[in-house]
Amino acid sequence: MPTLDTRAPATVGASAPPFVHPQRTRINLALFAIGMATFAMLFSTQALLPDIAAAYAVSPDQASWTVSATTVGLALAVLPLSTLSERFGRARLMTVSVTTAAGLALLLPLAPDLSSLIALRALQGAAIAGIPASAVAYLSEELDAGATVGAVGLFIAGNSVGGMSGRVLTGWVAEGAGWRAALAAVAVLAVVAALVYRLLLPRARFFTPASLRPRRVLASVAGHLRRPLLLRLYAIGLLLMAAFSAVYTVIGFRLVAEPFGLSAGLAGSVFVIYLVGTASSALSGPLLDRLGRRGALYAAICTAVAGLLLTLTASLGAVLVGLVLITGGFFFGHAVASGSVSRVATHGRAHASALYQVAYYLGASLGGTAGAAVYHRADWSGLVAFALLALVTTGLITLYATARARARSAALEPGLAA
């Protein structure tokens, strides 16, 4: 998951001293815990979609709304909540967010019908949004620059572990006790992680409240939306996530069906591959230095395309290798695109990053639901065609950006040609 930089001059203690070691350790562990809770809850129904579809007698695309509604809620709430964090405090907003989201998680197993489940998931997504809207800004304010880098890395690691463990846990619990029990297990995990976060996190020392200025926020957002290069990066983030979300939303349906016929637990276990994203994100820096931004995007797209083509075979081994390539390519491309947003934005970087997150999670919603609809009507080959269309479009946008960079003077957009 991308993290959101919401630092603002009015609230950052530029000369803030670093914490002593015990406090820094507590902060690191607290942010790891809340990062794990965030992604465990966010995608808790993804591995359960075949069971949910069967339980409510609905199509895959209808069941997929239990994932898409959550990411839509997050996308719509992240920008307003990042603004509220400037006024009311990062730690306070994260506490309210994780408490509310965990409380809603406890209600999910009790949902009497699909509409109720989708509504609860949308509310949960909006609650979760306060965490990525505040986490990096909190770390930037409370720790010195050197310690912040490691702390952000642990927060992202928590995201990866939570995203993987939530999916794998639900798959195995559902196989033995049903999908409602699986959601209850994730809720317990989220509550425990929320308690760990709350007990460990020290009181913020360097936060200074800023006044809410909606006009300034709107002006900053409008300015970013008028920049073609930022719009291209937002489109790339949306399309990459649409392809990735489509694959992982539907893969469970394919693996439990013939010719594979895996159990729910085994099908859910493929989400361990999600951890490949941690490695590819970590390698993005050195590869970016060698390939340049656009070269890195081409490499990411080609890797994901190769993975998609491998999944067309009837060999389980080839499908798993394909998923590894898709996952690695997606996370690499996402790391490049999201990192470029902060580099390109000359002002209001918090809002520029927030807009990227909006596009990213809208892509998750679009890809999950549209991909499931395509799969329902055209089987896996149709899903692959859908994801390929998204990736090819991403490549064309990157190609257009390359042509623009070569055609225009470097003085007009300094430092952006890769």
Where are these regions (language model features)?
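Helix-loop-helix hairpin linking two adjacent transmembrane segments in secondary transporters
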Residues: 116, 145-147, 153-201
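Cytoplasmic helix-loop-helix junction between adjacent transmembrane helices
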Residues: 120-160
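Helix-to-loop junctions at the C-terminal end of transmembrane segments
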Residues: 77-90, 280-293, 375
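Helix-breaking motifs and short loop linkers at transmembrane-helix boundaries and internal kinks
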Residues: 57, 89, 110-116, 144, ...
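Conserved MFS/SLC helix-loop-helix module at the cytosolic interface between two early adjacent transmembrane helices
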Residues: 76-114
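Juxtamembrane intracellular "pre-TM" segments in multi-pass secondary transporters
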Residues: 13-22, 202-234
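C-terminal transmembrane helical hairpin of 12-TM major facilitator-type secondary transporters
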Residues: 294-337
